[in-house]
Amino acid sequence: MAKKKAFTPLFYLASIVFLPWWISFSVNKWLESWVTNWWNTGQSQIVLNNIQEKSLLEKFRELEELLFLDEMIKEYSETHLEEFGIGIHKETIQLITIQNENRMDTILHFSTNIIWFGILSGYSILGKEKLVILNSWAQEFLYNLSDTAKALCILLVSEFFLGYHSPPGWEFVIRSIYNEVGVVANEQTITILVCILPVIFDTCFKYWLFRYLTSLSPSILLLYDSITE
């Protein structure tokens, strides 16, 4: 009976990690054909924001320059001029098709993320008792660690997320969030976020250290300071 009670929260933890993802993945496959049909039949024109329009124009200019260079290398005749125009037309259609697919992927990503968040929220609300048990297990595990181990864990987390080498990691996380949400990444916005977010989190982390850790466990704070020095 005790083993069964211990196994139930672990099964809940595994299900809360994989079940929402599996359901959202299945729904995504089901929505894909419907969104594709709706987008291709219901949209009379492609709507682009400034970032998407700029990106598409840059790709078109690069394509035009490459094709023009290719034709300059060949013999300059009317036949090649016609082939040049046909090549531009085909590649333009391909670029627009890719942009159209990206727009459909954006809608699918956004819809899937809403479904995933709804399932995860509902699952968490219905399983409050199991979450309480998992929380007590985590607290007991941390409580049983030595002060040195706790200080090393704090140092590892702080260096991983807030160290001098963390900006590439933050850039990867921000780009991943952009891709998951289905929003076109803006390089200037990403640069600003990479500069600001680590500073904000570092300030909050240091405030937590000196505001709470000083009263809870001064020895851990002393070990952390000695290790960092």
From Swiss-Prot:
Keyword Zinc-finger carried by entry: no
Main subcellular localisation: plastid
Name of one Pfam family that matches: CemA
Entry keyword annotation includes Plastid: yes
Residues that span the membrane, as ranges: 7-27, 107-127
UniProt keyword list: Antiport, Chloroplast, Hydrogen ion transport, Ion transport, Membrane, Plastid, Plastid inner membrane, Potassium, Potassium transport, Transmembrane, Transmembrane helix, Transport
Entry membrane topology: Multi-pass membrane protein
Cysteine disulfide links: none
Location of this chain's protein in the cell: Plastid, Chloroplast inner membrane
Catalytic activity field: K(+)(in) + H(+)(out) = K(+)(out) + H(+)(in)
Any GO BP: potassium ion transport
GO molecular function: antiporter activity; proton transmembrane transporter activity
Entry's family note: Belongs to the CemA family.
Function: Contributes to K(+)/H(+) antiport activity by supporting proton efflux to control proton extrusion and homeostasis in chloroplasts in a light-dependent manner to modulate photosynthesis. Prevents excessive induction of non-photochemical quenching (NPQ) under continuous-light conditions. Indirectly promotes efficient inorganic carbon uptake into chloroplasts.
Name by which UniProt lists this protein: Potassium/proton antiporter CemA
Source organism per UniProt: Solanum lycopersicum
